[in-house]
Amino acid sequence: MPPPAWGWGSNPLEPVVHTVAAFSRRLLIAPDAAPDEARLRPLLSLSLSPPPTPPSPPPPPPEVLKKDSKAAPLTKEEVGRATWMLLHTIAAQFPDEPTRQQRRDARELMAIISRLYPCKECAEHFKEVLKANPVQAGSQAEFSQWLCYVHNVVNRSLGKPIFPCQRVNARWGKLDCPERSCDLEGSNDIIPNR
């Protein structure tokens, strides 16, 4: 196929594309059959035009739009609530008789939070609170009560209400997990016996 009068353009693969396109027009599915329009369609179609843009993803369900109509970073208060929720849930799941490593992990978790917490002034305050009130993680009850006490120390400094720590298990009790699957120690069974 001779080059077009206007030249090959700037794409170095353009001659190859034109040659392959011309060759594919001449291929027949069944060479001994009479040519018809369907059989003369190219088996291969190459184009130098950009690929079509993929369809845009479907919009989120309406309940997602209603729930969070603002697309903004979390506030300091929202991060605080989420952090306390996580910590109280961890304390509620903490073993009644933790291993030395689990007690160490509880202390280290609090130390890490005091270093990495996304609110600098909150992290500094939490370091002070931890220094004055070292982590108590000898059992689930002790860890939960200590965390409730520390949470109340923070709440007092913010002028927020104090939570009655005798109700901590009613508020943050163990997760409802079948066959103790929420236990930190878990079980050695890969598949539970039925």
Swiss-Prot record:
The gene is ERV1. Its cofactor is FAD. FAD binds at residues 76, 81, 84, 121, 125, 148, 151-152, 155, 160, 171. Contains three disulfide bonds; one catalytic disulfide (Cys-119 to Cys-122), one structural disulfide (Cys-148 to Cys-165), and one shuttle disulfide (Cys-177 to Cys-182). Disulfide bonds join 119-122, 148-165, 177-182. Its main location: mitochondrion. Coiled coil: none annotated. FAD-dependent sulfhydryl oxidase that catalyzes disulfide bond formation. Oxidizes thioredoxin in vitro. Required for the import and folding of small cysteine-containing proteins in the mitochondrial intermembrane space, and can act independently of the oxidoreductase MIA40. Can oxidize the cytochrome c oxidase assembly protein COX19, a typical substrate of MIA40. InterPro entries: ALR/ERV, ERV/ALR_sulphydryl_oxid_sf, ERV/ALR_sulphydryl_oxidase. Homodimer. Residues 49-63 have a biased composition (Pro residues). This is FAD-linked sulfhydryl oxidase ERV1. It is found in: Mitochondrion. Its EC number is 1.8.3.2.
